[in-house]
C-alpha cells in the first residue's frame, strides 16, 4: 500500500476522535511548556548563583601567593609589576582588579568587630558586587582615597555613623600589628547583611601605605590578589594555564577551586535539570503509550475489518503508528 494512502487514512482517523486527540495534544503542549519553563528557571538560578560567586571578590580567575589561601595576611602578598595589564592569548579579559584583602579588627568609640579589610581601585571594581552597592554618604573616590566605607549593618553594630572615625588594626607585611584611623566616607546597603558585616573598603594605595613594607622607601607596592573577569567563563582553564606561566611562583585558580561549594551546587543544578526533564518526558511517554493502547483497544473491530479486507498486518501497524 502506498505510504500516501497510509497518511490519508491516519489523518482521517485523527479527525474522527477530536476530543481524545485534542486532549492528547494539550497534554503534550503542557509537558513541553513545563519542561521548558522548569529548565529556564533552573538555568536562571544556576547562572545567578555563578554570578554571585564570581562577584563576591573572586572573579573567574584569581592570582594569589601560594600560601595566602591557608594563611591570608600581608606576609603572603606580592609585588605587581608597574603598569601591569593582563594579556591572555585567545581569551578576552572583561575586567581585572588588584586588591589587598586581609583580616582586621575595626574599632569605634563603643564597639569592635572582625572584618575583611579590602584595599581596592574603585574604577576597576565593576567586576565585583562593590559596583552595585547603594551608598549613604559617599563612596571611595579613587585608588588614593584614604577614607573607609563600611556596611550599614556593621555601622549599626559599631554604633557609629558617616563622618566619624574608626581605628583599624591588622598585621602588616613585616609581621607587626599596625593600627590606623580612618574616617567613614559612607555606608553601603548590600543584598544581605552578611556582606554588610564582613567587608570594609578603602583605597588600594591607602591600604598599601598602611600595611606595606616600610623597610625601604623604594619597596614596591604590594597586593594580595589579582582578580580577573573573562568575557567567556568557559575559557577559564586557558586563562589559568597562561597566567601560571606569567606568575610561576603564585597560586592561580579559577572560581570553582576558590568557591568549591558554589561549584558543587552549579554541577548539581545540571543534574537536577536532566532528572526533571527525564521525569517529565517519561510521564509524557507513558501518557502517549496509554492513549495508543486505548485507541487500539476501542478499534479492534475496525482493525479486524481492515485485515479481513486484505490489508497486511504490517500496514495496519504502520497506519496506527503514523496516526
Q: What are the residue ranges of the model-derived segments?
A:
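Alpha-helical transmembrane segments of multi-pass membrane proteins
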Residues: 12-16, 314, 318-323
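Solvent-exposed, non-transmembrane alpha-helical starts
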Residues: 72-79, 107-109, 114, 125-130, ...
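Hydrophobic, regular-secondary-structure patches
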Residues: 35-116, 138-144
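Hydrophobic alpha-helical transmembrane segments of multi-pass inner-membrane transport and secretion
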Residues: 18-45, 267-302
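Hydrophobic secondary-structure segments that place a key small or acidic residue at a functional site
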Residues: 99-100, 113-121, 135-205
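Short, membrane-interfacial amphipathic segments enriched in basic
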Residues: 1-8
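Mechanotransmission and gating elements of multispan inner-membrane complexes involved in transport
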Residues: 172-273
